[in-house]
Amino acid sequence: MIKKIFLLFFILITSNISAQEIAVLQYGGGGDWYSNPTALPNLIQFCNDQINTTISRNPKVVKPNDVDLFDYPFVHMTGHGNVFFTQEEAKNLRDYLLSGGFLHIDDNYGMDQYLRKELVKIFPNKELIELPNNHVIFKEPFSFPQGLPKIHEHDNSRPQAYAIFNEGRLVLLYTFESDLGDGWENPEVHNDPQEVRLKALRMGANIIKYAFED
């Protein structure tokens, strides 16, 4: 019995050591960076179960000017309202992205008008480019022939996926008019049909896979 307990403890310890960590971005400006609290943990569980990732089940929280930012290969950002980066934060985010990091921004409806002007601080000489439906991020491991799926309807606008590239590498993905994070939340939060939640989780898995491998 003691041996079994020790073995279980050893497995838990080694699995935690080998697990990859990802983070949520705690930005300034008053926007609700903390919205969709069950979203990322659910996406992590889905990815670990379905595409064999080994991501730590509890995402961390990181600020734009934290040195720890560089510890995470994938950082997620969401919210409904205002976003603000200081020049120091913008530089740190730029350095992070140019050093191999990946930022996924999911507009939870209401962020767009604030976000776009702050992205200019990070990359003053780069523009958001809409991804075509045949981009690899919509192909692997799950196929989305029509591109970014629509998860929540707000104003009858089509879902759009925008990107910023550096030397051919996609470093920032901005999902707009889709609301992927709402689809990742616990079922009882939005009462989405299972097929809608599955679309959101599968698209999220594609993003995670792309961020980790490209």
Q: What do the PLM-derived regions correspond to, one by one?
A:
Residues S18-F74, T78-G81, V171, D179-L180, ...:
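Aromatic-Pro/Gly-enriched surface loop or interdomain linker
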Residues N48-N52, L98-G101, V120-P124, F212-E213:
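Sec-exported extracytoplasmic/periplasmic mature domains
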Residues K4-T14:
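Sec-dependent N-terminal signal peptides
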Residues T54-K63, I105-N108, K126-P132:
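Surface-exposed patches in mature extracellular/periplasmic domains of secreted proteins
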